[in-house]
């Protein structure tokens, strides 16, 4: 066979999966699939068994597909996706009816969280429509897209968990959990189906690649999507287009380093870049607020909307809706252009974790450089996010994020951060995305009296095989100036498992002596550590000693053990966005 891509139909791949994992039931001596004596199962039942065997909830999967009178795996998969779409629609309608039924008994926070639930469920529907559209009518020639479609399905699942994660009122959380449980189960099963196919393809040596320049249709919101391709020779993801590479280069050209090791500091003034919109507090730009500039960007933009935010302190909360895709913001330096706001769950009525964010990115293709993001609520405000990113393919360079609890919310999609500073106390890097933070400075702060510090809190609740998790590569984890004197008495940990399959990997990183010898800790009242995945490899510094790590933390001995978590494999296919001088080369 000639070397090159092998394009395989979904139908044939699903049959391969059935054989590969040994799930097709062969009937002997007239026995049924379950060992009964009701006669041999028909071809439809065999196909359903094949598809459903690898799912988390096989009973639900079979029940969904039983009414589909076909043995064509392609038709069954599409029918499953359509059933998932119907279930999410019902979840959205249930949310609206729940809100309406509460009437005057609903407080400001309940109103806010239910409105947020309606919004993210609509996003889930839009993405699911995209998935169905990209698979086509006959689902043929889809083999090369399956890994990407699985990533989008993971986002659909995360949108539904977002809703529940933001609800703190016990009774409302129970009501909503029951109301949207069916759509969560179906979405989870859909991810499992795609994962099995992709795994089988990899085992066969079939290349799982993404099609180029796939564009969403109007039914899915119309926002342009550019999928991943192969690795770039200069260390940039191929989904990071040539034009975007030039924009990033120009935005940083001639920028002096400064501050903490030059990370996240300095300024560029935009170099030779030509902004689409200019924001300036002194009136020298087209807009005085960032929100105005965002709303002036085109909806469903196939190109790039470029916003230059001139030096100044912008006291505003900025939300970038899903339809405002492909926005690139750049400032005049992370300590010169600062977006700040004071909003928190504890001190701001009608606020949830997601809604506390100073900047809230809900769109694809977001880029930022030379900007500071702050939430000034303080430690008494509890959850208070500086930046929340829900959109896929986020690339952020030379920025700074300051807060206390929940500073940086890496909540969905694939995200890459390079040369940033992020400060905080409790769970201050957290979320449910595939995120790599590289060559960055992580400052642990002093919080409320008696409060411990946790750098990370990953929220993977789907499964250990999913690309959901936080990777810190070639970073520095040290105390800030206020914590320095008390760094050995205040307990600080690398992280704790927010959800059942929490995944966090630390590679080639300097870990200061502020980190307790055990390194990691359990989530109070939960058993998530038993199924979580924590890996350390080739770290350095006094806090990197692993002799007292708990047994559920893996200390990798070779690069091969962490190859999955390179930029190329975790947020790719991709290569390093910039070369990093680390003692181990990953992805070789």
Curated annotation (Swiss-Prot):
One Gene Ontology term of the biological-process aspect is: pectin catabolic process
Instruction: Glycosylated residues: list them.
Output: 93, 107, 213, 231
Q: What does the entry list under GO cellular component? A: extracellular region; pollen tube
The leader peptide range reads: 1-22
Query: What metabolic or biological pathway is this protein involved in?
Result: Glycan metabolism; pectin degradation; 2-dehydro-3-deoxy-D-gluconate from pectin: step 1/5
Gene3D superfamilies annotated for this entry?
Invertase/pectin methylesterase inhibitor family protein, Single-stranded right-handed beta-helix, Pectin lyase-like
**UniProt region (Pectinesterase VGDH2), positions on chain:** 276-574
> Acyltransferase: present as a keyword of the record?
no
Q: Which residues cross the membrane?
A: none
Main localization (coarse): secreted
Q: Where in the cell is it found?
A: Secreted, Cell wall
What class does this enzyme belong to in the EC scheme?
hydrolase
Q: Where is the active site?
A: 406, 427
Query: A Gene Ontology MF term for this entry?
Result: pectinesterase activity
PANTHER family membership = PECTINESTERASE (PTHR31707)
Q: Which family does it belong to?
A: In the N-terminal section; belongs to the PMEI family. In the C-terminal section; belongs to the pectinesterase family.
NCBIfam families cross-referenced by the UniProt entry: PME_inhib (TIGR01614)
Listed name of the protein: Probable pectinesterase/pectinesterase inhibitor VGDH2
